[in-house]
Curated annotation (Swiss-Prot):
Residues 95-108 have a biased composition (Gly residues). Residues 1-74 are annotated as: Required for nuclear localization and apoptosis-inducing activity. It comes from the Eukaryota. This is Nuclear apoptosis-inducing factor 1.
């Protein structure tokens, strides 16, 4: 007995493209008061479902294959999971870095106890936007002893200098501060950058004040990084929204231009039809004139024929003859 045919293998869909992910994040930023948990208190389920269907419609407008609503929700869940995992790594590494600085670990900054350099965890701009939507701590990068990794990515000439408290016995030894060093401080929300300084030598005469100042410079609050990253994310979001509006305006103008061209073509067609009508009227008038000229002689001949066939009136009788006839009759 033959076995039943195996069901056809389900064709695997393509991964979400960057444009699809960007549309999902943009729509969630636009409708965060409907779809994000810590914003949508009291929002009815019908409004949430309508917002998700709008997102699905926009994704399918640019997707190469048809997407279903569970796929879009699953993609958003995966994006949130990835961002939260990176944020957890950042926090854990920062706590570990703080303990190593306070405890004066044997390893150098930016290195694990085994001697291997820890790779920084960097959030992409898209992940930073998702992080802002989720309400997580806004962190550009994880420095294992180097908090300026994200800034160095943006500007290689800017470097963040970190200092630790040195032992009293070691503070007497001169230590040079390398040139091309970046300082940034939080004073009333103002970030100051000072680059390409000359090397500074810390001597034993005034080590305590210098090291205390350097420690204050190095121990920057998380609020500064959060504020910088949040401002960057907002600017990027506004720029993308502006670009989207510009594209929509351009599409609207193109549609208007197409409509005007159609109107012009219809007017040209109407003008051609009117011109053909005028030419036809002129031809008809010419034909009627020729017909009238042909019929005139025929009408004249017909009149003559009628006149020739009509009997002439009788001649008037003589009055004498008329009187004789009257007498005979009497």
């Amino acid at each position: 007995m033959a076995s039943p045919p195996a069901p056809p293998a389900k064709k695997r869909k393509m991964n979400f493209s960057e444009r699809e992910v960007e549309i999902i994040v943009e729509e969630l930023e636009r409708g965060k008061h409907l779809l994000i948990n810590h914003f949508n208190a009291g929002v009815p389920l019908a409004a949430k479902a309508a917002a998700w269907h709008d997102i699905l419609r926009r994704v399918n407008a640019v997707a190469t294959c048809h997407r279903e609503l569970p796929e879009v929700k699953k993609k958003w869940s995966d994006l949130k999971t990835e961002v939260r995992r990176k944020v957890a790594q950042v926090r854990a590494a920062m706590e570990g870095g703080g303990e190593s600085q306070n405890g004066g670990g044997a390893g150098t900054e930016g290195e694990d106890p085994t001697g291997a350099t820890a790779a920084p965890v960097i959030l992409t701009p898209m992940q930073q936007r998702i992080c802002n939507l989720l309400g997580e701590a806004t962190i550009i990068s994880l420095p294992s002893g180097d908090c300026g990794a994200g800034r160095r990515d943006r500007d290689p000439h800017h470097r963040l200098r970190h200092h630790r408290h040195a032992d009293p016995g070691v503070s007497a030894a001169p230590s040079e501060v390398p040139a091309e060093t970046t300082y940034h401080s939080l004073e009333d929300g103002v970030v100051e950058y000072c680059t390409t300084e000359a090397p500074t030598t810390v001597t034993a005469e005034a080590p305590l004040e210098m090291m205390a100042h350097q420690h204050e410079v190095s121990a920057k609050p998380q609020e500064l990084k959060s504020r910088i990253a949040l401002n960057s994310a907002k600017l990027l979001q506004e720029q993308r929204v502006t670009n989207l509006h510009v594209k929509e305006i351009a599409q609207h103008l193109e549609q208007q231009n197409d409509l005007l061209q159609m109107i012009r073509r219809s007017q040209e067609v109407q003008a051609c039809a009117q011109e053909r009508q005028a030419q036809a009227m002129e031809g008809t008038q010419a034909a009627l004139s020729a017909l009238i000229q042909v019929l005139r002689p025929m009408i004249k001949d017909f009149r003559r024929f009628l006149q020739s066939n009509t009997p002439s009136p009788s001649v008037t009788a003589d009055p004498n003859q008329t009187g004789q006839q009257d007498g005979i009759i009497q």
